[in-house]
Design a protein with these regions (language model features):
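Ribokinase/PfkB-type carbohydrate-kinase core domain
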Residues: 1-15, 73-91, 95, 102-262, ...
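Glycine-rich phosphate/adenosyl-contacting loop at the front of the ribokinase-like
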Residues: 1-84, 272-276, 337-338
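Alpha-helix C-terminal capping segments
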Residues: 49-57, 104-105, 290-293
Length: 338
C-alpha cells in the first residue's frame, strides 16, 4: 500500500478585512481606522497557507465552498500563489463568499463581525469525491458550519458522520472549534465528533466550554492545574492520539499513551504584538506538521508555539509564517522552558 503524505483541510473559507484601530469606542462614538488590509481567513486557509509558507514540501489541498465574487477570486488566487490544490473548492452561484470585518486594537486584541455566506451550505455531498492520498484531514470550524452542525440519527451530528467517513477512508482526522462563550451547543455538537478524531487542538476557552471546567477565572488568571483535567476529559471522550489545549501562557498536550507536557509559550513583549488573527490556526499548523512527521510531544508543542509567536508579529493570519528551518533555529536559540 502506498504511504500517505500531506494534509487536506476543509471547512470555513473566508476573507478577513483587518482594520487597525487605536481603541474600542464607546457606543455611539467614532474611532478612526488607521490601517486596513485584506487577507484570507478561516481554518482551512490559515492552516494550509501557514504550512505552505513553512516550505515543508508536504502536498496540501483545500476543500470548501466560496461565492462567485471578488473575495472568492482572491481566495483562489492565494491558493494558486502558494501551490495549494484548489480542485475541491466549489463556487456557489447563490451565496456570497464568507467574510469577517476584524477590528484589531494595540496589543493584538481583536473583535470579529462575521458573515457566514457560502460556508453555511457546505455539506456531506461536497466530500463524496474526496479519496486522496493525503495523510491528515483537518476540519474547521465546528459550530460555524451550519449544514454539518445539523443532527444525524446514527452519528449524532453530520460533522461526526463526515469525520467517521474520513477515518474509514484512511485519513488521520483533526478538528478545530470556534470560540463562542456560553454557547449551549458546545457539548451536543462536539461530543459526537470526538470518537472519530485523532487530533484535537483547541484553546482554553473552548476546552472550558466543553468540559465545564473554569480554566480562566473572572480576573483572567489561568487555572493551569485544571488544564490536565480538561485534556484527560477530552481524551476519555474519544480522541485517539493527541489533545492539545493552548492559551497565551502556554499549552498542555496529552497523548493516548499517557505522555503529558505543559510547555510555556515563547516570551514576547506586548509592543511586538501586531495582531492575533489566526494565531490559533498557526499553532494548529505546527501541531499538524509535527504530528504528520511523528515528532515527540515536546518538540511538537515547541514548534506550535514558534508558529504562533511569529504569527503575532503581523496583522493578518499568514504573513508572519516562517520557513521551517527558521522556526527550528529560533527554537534552538531559546533558553530551556520550565
Amino acid at each position: 500500500m502506498m504511504s500517505r503524505c500531506g494534509i487536506v483541510s476543509a471547512g470555513n473559507m473566508l476573507v478577513d478585512h483587518v482594520h487597525q484601530i487605536a481603541h474600542w469606542p464607546q457606543p455611539g462614538w467614532l474611532v478612526e481606522i488607521e490601517h486596513s488590509q485584506r487577507a484570507t481567513g478561516g481554518a482551512p486557509l490559515n492552516v494550509l497557507l501557514t504550512l505552505a509558507r513553512m516550505e515543508t514540501g508536504l502536498p496540501l489541498a483545500a476543500l470548501g465552498l466560496i461565492g462567485c465574487d471578488a473575495d472568492g477570486d482572491y481566495i483562489l488566487q492565494m491558493l494558486a500563489q502558494y501551490q495549494v490544490d484548489s480542485g475541491r473548492v466549489r463556487r456557489s452561484e447563490t451565496a456570497m463568499t464568507s467574510m469577517s470585518q476584524v477590528m484589531t486594537e494595540p496589543g493584538g486584541q481583536r473583535t470579529f463581525f462575521h458573515a457566514p455566506g457560502a460556508n453555511r451550505l457546505l455539506d456531506l455531498g461536497d466530500f463524496d469525491a474526496l479519496h486522496s492520498n493525503h495523510k491528515i484531514f483537518h476540519l474547521g470550524y465546528l459550530l460555524l458550519l451550519d449544514s454539518l452542525d445539523c443532527p444525524d440519527e446514527e452519528f449524532g451530528t453530520r460533522s461526526a458522520r463526515l469525520l467517521a467517513q474520513m477515518q474509514q477512508r484512511g485519513y488521520q482526522t483533526s478538528l478545530d472549534l470556534v470560540s463562542r462563550q456560553g454557547d449551549p451547543r458546545y457539548r451536543p455538537l462536539v461530543l459526537p465528533a470526538l470518537r472519530w478524531l485523532d487530533y484535537l487542538v483547541i484553546n482554553e476557552l473552548e476546552a472550558g466550554e466543553f468540559t465545564g471546567l473554569t480554566l480562566r477565572t473572572a480576573n483572567g488568571s489561568l487555572q493551569q492545574s485544571l488544564m490536565a483535567q480538561a485534556a484527560e476529559q477530552l481524551l476519555q471522550a474519544g480522541v485517539r492520539r493527541r489533545v492539545v489545549i493552548h492559551c497565551p501562557e502556554g499549552a498542555y498536550g496529552l497523548e493516548s499513551g499517557g505522555e503529558a507536557r505543559w510547555q510555556p509559550s515563547w516570551q514576547m513583549r506586548e509592543a511586538e504584538i501586531v495582531g492575533s488573527v489566526g494565531a490559533g490556526d498557526a499553532f494548529c499548523a505546527g501541531v499538524l506538521y509535527a504530528s504528520h512527521e511523528d515528532w515527540p510531544l515536546v518538540e511538537t508543542l515547541q514548534l506550535a508555539h514558534a508558529c504562533a509567536r511569529f504569527n503575532l508579529l503581523c496583522a493578518n493570519a499568514i504573513d508572519g509564517a516562517r520557513p521551517l528551518p527558521e522556526l527550528q533555529d529560533f527554537i534552538r536559540r531559546q533558553p530551556p522552558a520550565g
